[in-house]
C-alpha cells in the first residue's frame, strides 16, 4: 500500500526509517515536516501494524510498507521468523533506497532493513537516538552511520566521535512556550501514565490520597488514568476529599503541563524531552519492562541534572508517593530551572540541516 504526495520535481529525496511506537514515529514526523517545508520530497518506510501506519498517511507523506518484526522481548520462533525474512526485506528496501539522497533513522526494528540497504548502496545514513541507552538497531549500525544525533550527552559515547551531536529530540513548540509557574498555596500535581495509563501510578496515587487528606497537605490532583482503570479511580477519588479531577486521557498535554507544579510520570524519551522543554520538575517512575531498561537510563540522566527524582516501579507505593512529593516541594523552582537547562530547542531544524549537509546529489 502506497500513499502519494505532490511535491516539487526539483526536491531532494529523503527516506525516513523507524517505527513501531509513537516514540519512533512522532520525532521522525517533526523532521519530515521541516524537510517538506524546505521543498524536499520525503517518504516513509514502515509496517502495516506499527504506529507509523496510523500516523504517517494523514500527514500526506508517501508511505511504503515492509514485513519485519522485532527481536527484543519476543519468542525464539518470532526471532527466527524475523531473521529469515530479513534478507528479502532488505533487498526490497534497496529499491526504495536507490533514489534517496539520504536516509534518516529513528531506530527500532523497522529501521533495520532500509538502513542496511542504504549502507550497502553507500547512501548516507543519519540516525537519531532518542534514549539515553541506544536501542538494538542503533547499537548495531552505530559505527557505520554518516552522522548521529542524540538526546542525552552520555549517549554520544556509543557513536563515532566527530560525527555525533547532542541535538535533543523534536518536541512540540507549545512545550517550549510554557512560562515558569509561580507556586501557589496549593501544590498542583499532574499524574500521567501515557495514553494507556500506568497500573503502578494509578495504584500508588490512589493509596496516597488518605495520606494527603489526613496530613492536611494542600494539593490539587489531575490524574490521567487511561481508559481501563478510569471508572474505578474516578469513583475512589470522589470519596477522597481532595481537590482535582480524574480523566481517562488528556487531549491538550501542553496545557496540562503548564498548570502543574510537579509531574509524576513514566520516563520515555518523548516524555523526558517534553518535561525539559516545559521546565517542569518531575518524579519519574520508569516502566520496568522497556527494552534494555532504557527508561531507567533516561530517568537517571534527568535526575543527575537535578531536574527529577527517580523512583523504581517496584518501590512506588502510596507511602512512597506521599514521601517523595512532600520531600521535593521545597526544590521545585531549582528542579524546574535544571529541567529547562537540559532542553535542546530546534532539534527538528538541526536534523534537517544535517540531512541536507550529508545528502548525495
UniProtKB/Swiss-Prot annotation:
Pathway field: Cell wall biogenesis; peptidoglycan biosynthesis
Catalyzed chemical reaction(s): di-trans,octa-cis-undecaprenyl diphospho-N-acetyl-alpha-D-muramoyl-L-alanyl-D-glutamyl-meso-2,6-diaminopimeloyl-D-alanyl-D-alanine + UDP-N-acetyl-alpha-D-glucosamine = di-trans,octa-cis-undecaprenyl diphospho-[N-acetyl-alpha-D-glucosaminyl-(1->4)]-N-acetyl-alpha-D-muramoyl-L-alanyl-D-glutamyl-meso-2,6-diaminopimeloyl-D-alanyl-D-alanine + UDP + H(+)
Binding site for UDP-N-acetyl-alpha-D-glucosamine: 21-23, 131, 172, 195, 250, 295
GO cellular component, one term: plasma membrane
Lineage, opening ranks: Bacteria, Pseudomonadati, Acidobacteriota, Terriglobia, Bryobacterales
InterPro entries: GlcNAc_MurG, Glyco_trans_28_C, GlycoTrans_28_N
Known role: Cell wall formation. Catalyzes the transfer of a GlcNAc subunit on undecaprenyl-pyrophosphoryl-MurNAc-pentapeptide (lipid intermediate I) to form undecaprenyl-pyrophosphoryl-MurNAc-(pentapeptide)GlcNAc (lipid intermediate II).
Gene that encodes it: murG
Any single biological process term in GO: carbohydrate metabolic process
Protein name: UDP-N-acetylglucosamine--N-acetylmuramyl-(pentapeptide) pyrophosphoryl-undecaprenol N-acetylglucosamine transferase
Keywords on record: Cell cycle, Cell division, Cell inner membrane, Cell membrane, Cell shape, Cell wall biogenesis/degradation, Glycosyltransferase, Membrane, Peptidoglycan synthesis, Transferase
Top-rank lineage group of the source organism: Bacteria
Family: Belongs to the glycosyltransferase 28 family. MurG subfamily.
Organism: Solibacter usitatus (strain Ellin6076)
Xref: PANTHER family: GLYCOSYLTRANSFERASE, UDP-N-ACETYLGLUCOSAMINE--N-ACETYLMURAMYL-(PENTAPEPTIDE) PYROPHOSPHORYL-UNDECAPRENOL N-ACETYLGLUCOSAMINE TRANSFERASE 1
EC number in record: 2.4.1.227
EC top class named in words: transferase
Primary localization class, coarse: membrane
A molecular function GO annotation: undecaprenyldiphospho-muramoylpentapeptide beta-N-acetylglucosaminyltransferase activity
UniProt topology in membrane: Peripheral membrane protein
Compartments reported by the entry: Cell inner membrane
Coiled coil segments of this chain: none
UniProt-listed Gene3D superfamilies: Glycogen Phosphorylase B
Signal peptide, first to last residue: none
Key word Manganese present: no
